[in-house]
Design a protein with these regions (language model features):
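Ribonuclease/tRNase effector modules and their secretory precursors
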Residues: 1-101
Length: 101
């Protein structure tokens, strides 16, 4: 997979959330879950991926442009997101939303 991002946004994200986009790319190497982010009209399809990086569940907002994943933000998953992720794994009801890197 190829990744891209805005460098100023990456630096601001490290300060705000403590997660570097260079580390967030590794989420896509292991099991992860993707949900569509439809909270607003972004003018493009945005998704949020949830997965573990260094034993920490993170959320990565991104958009896919052809074969490139453009990272928009990355942060530690909140408690509600952690529960949703854990429930999906435990129940295996949503296996079509899990992807192996």
């Amino acid at each position: 997979m190829k990744f891209e991002w805005d460098e100023e946004k990456r630096l601001a994200n490290v300060v705000k959330h403590g997660v570097d986009f260079t580390d967030a790319c590794r989420l896509f190497e292991g099991p992860f879950m993707i949900m569509t982010d439809n909270r607003r009209d972004y003018g493009e399809i945005r998704s949020i991926a949830f997965g573990h990086v260094e034993n920490r569940l993170i959320a990565v907002a991104f958009t896919k442009r052809q074969d490139i994943i453009r990272i928009i933000s990355a942060r530690k998953a909140n408690d509600r997101e952690k529960k949703r992720f854990e429930d999906a794994i435990a129940d295996r009801l949503e296996t079509n939303r899990f992807h192996e890197g």
